[in-house]
């Protein structure tokens, strides 16, 4: 087998009008590997030569750190050895459909915000003979794909598949979101039962740096008493109301997103976690930790991003893969397949998709069950989308 330094690059192979590049970027979520398998199967079935960037967007720039930068993806193992013998880096994907994590990405690549890096990547894309592009990730990867089209040019068909714990793009249910809620709500519910047993107040920090949808849905599903989202901030009057309500109840679970009051916390040394910062705020407002009723800030964990996807995510991955290749075959570009329900799926143009970090009005009654009129009014006036609040 050739060493990594001696593998052929796509540019050294015969040209192919259906050489599609898959780029995986952004934060990890259940379903990255599932989407890779689905795109490999569907692309191969339709006659595409499928490749993946081994480090996401970084692989197309001079800041790449691994070799080879691109790997050919196939379904089974039957042709793998022959391709390796020819010096082609190749990976068989068929049995990875339920794998956690992803083999083809690094941490989100912020260098792509620079136009010079996107231009460099477009030149590498063309040099390697790629003819179609599918980016996979969340809202940051989507923004990168949209921006990159300027350098790639209109002749390159571009698609995007939404994979994210946060589910922060409009008009789609992200692959990974449902699995994340199922796993996260299970942990939250366990803490609620512990709170009930020992008469405690738990402030549980959950994923959500900018988007609070994961924390919101986990909190609602676990029947948390209060959900605090990343874009929330509270005046003293609301904090006093929260502290008084929590002091009155025997036990409670408060779900707080990791991005809560991030800018304020960054100014403190050492920087407290979101749950600890909220605990300190509530303590100043009158909620005291004591031997008869503990008030405990539970730390944040990213392990939910590395759990295996649910089978429902597999179905969505294959449907989205089919839809994106349908679009390419029909001559469309700048499209995102969506799957909202069994009878609600299709394609959206990039122009019709946006990031969304606010609270939908329908969820307002579900944010708390302590009876907090000041909290409800404050959130409704400042943070509910479509009601004068921030998105």
Please state what every model-predicted region is.
Residues 2-14, 65-131, 140-141, 165, ...:
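Glycine-rich oxoanion-binding loops at beta->alpha junctions
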Residues 7-72:
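N-terminal phosphate-binding or glycine-rich loops at protein starts, especially the Walker A/P-loop
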Residues 19-29, 102-108, 131-136, 201-205, ...:
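Short glycine-rich or small-residue beta-strand-to-loop segments that form or flank ligand, phosphate
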Residues 25-28, 53-59, 108-109, 138-139, ...:
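Short, ordered loop/turn segments at secondary-structure junctions
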Residues 29-39, 60-61, 115-119, 138-146, ...:
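Short glycine/serine/threonine-rich phosphate/pyrophosphate-binding segments
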Residues 50-54, 66, 74, 124, ...:
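Accessory alpha-helical/coil subdomains and C-terminal extensions
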Residues 267-391:
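C-terminal non-catalytic interaction/assembly regions of soluble proteins
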């Amino acid at each position: 087998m050739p060493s990594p330094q001696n593998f052929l690059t796509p540019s050294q192979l015969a040209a192919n009008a259906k050489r599609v590049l898959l780029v995986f970027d952004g934060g990890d979520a259940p379903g990255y590997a599932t989407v890779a398998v689905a795109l490999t199967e569907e692309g191969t079935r339709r006659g595409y030569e499928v490749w993946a960037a081994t480090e996401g967007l970084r692989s197309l720039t001079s800041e790449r750190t691994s070799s080879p930068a691109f790997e050919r993806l196939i379904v089974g193992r039957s042709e793998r050895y022959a391709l390796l013998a020819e010096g082609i880096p190749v990976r068989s994907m068929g049995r990875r459909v339920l794998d956690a994590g992803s083999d083809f990405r690094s941490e989100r690549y912020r260098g792509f915000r620079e136009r010079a890096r996107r231009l460099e990547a477009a030149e590498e894309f063309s040099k390697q003979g790629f003819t179609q592009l599918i980016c996979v990730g969340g809202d940051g990867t989507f923004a990168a794909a949209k921006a990159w089209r300027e350098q790639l040019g209109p002749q390159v068909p571009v698609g995007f598949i939404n994979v994210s714990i946060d589910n922060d793009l409009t008009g789609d249910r992200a692959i990974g979101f449902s699995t994340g809620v199922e796993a996260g709500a299970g942990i939250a519910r366990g803490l609620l039962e512990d709170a009930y047993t020992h008469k405690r107040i738990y402030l549980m920090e959950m994923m959500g740096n900018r988007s609070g949808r994961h924390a919101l849905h986990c909190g609602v599903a676990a029947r948390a008493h209060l959900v605090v989202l990343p874009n929330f901030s509270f005046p003293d009057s609301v904090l006093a109301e929260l502290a008084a309500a929590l002091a009155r109840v025997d036990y409670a679970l408060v779900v707080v997103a990791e991005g809560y009051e991030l800018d304020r916390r960054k100014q403190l040394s050492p920087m407290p976690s979101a749950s600890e910062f909220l605990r300190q705020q509530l303590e100043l407002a009158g909620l005291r930790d004591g031997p008869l009723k503990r008030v405990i800030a539970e730390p944040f964990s990213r392990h939910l991003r590395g759990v295996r996807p649910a089978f429902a995510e597999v179905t969505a991955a294959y449907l989205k893969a089919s839809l994106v290749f349908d679009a390419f075959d029909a001559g469309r570009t700048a499209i995102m397949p969506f799957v909202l329900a069994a009878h609600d799926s299709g394609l959206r143009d990039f122009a019709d998709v946006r990031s969304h970090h606010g609270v939908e009005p329908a969820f307002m009654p579900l944010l708390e069950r302590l009876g907090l009129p000041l909290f409800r009014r404050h959130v409704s006036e400042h943070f509910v989308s479509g009601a004068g609040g921030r998105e």
